[in-house]
């Protein structure tokens, strides 16, 4: 698991369990249940780097859609509505993607 040493398997499993149904994903709840919101800024940056699949320095909409699958290969993709809401919440500068600082603000408001 790519998040070993940052997040516990049990916390990740619990967070994923609570958003199995379509349109049930809430990023604030997920970050709290997975333990991410209580991690250091460096840990949050490390998680961002894992989520930034193409290493562009940003998490784009397509990467957000597959957000849950970064935590478990068997997790579902986010719905279009969930993806757009997640992007809108995190994209504070309106460029259509989430940078590392925006991600940190999203995780630790």
Curated annotation (Swiss-Prot):
One annotated GO molecular function: calcium ion binding
Domain of life: Eukaryota
Keyword check for Calcium: yes
SMART domains assigned: EFh
Limits of the EF-hand domain: 39-74, 78-109
Keywords carried by this UniProt record: Calcium, Metal-binding, Muscle protein, Repeat
CDD domains recorded: EFh_parvalbumin_beta (cd16255)
Keyword Nucleotide-binding: no
A Gene Ontology term for the protein's cellular component: cytoplasm
Annotated function: In muscle, parvalbumin is thought to be involved in relaxation after contraction. It binds two calcium ions.
PANTHER family per UniProt: PARVALBUMIN ALPHA, PARVALBUMIN BETA
Family recorded in the similarity comment: Belongs to the parvalbumin family.
UniProt protein name: Parvalbumin beta
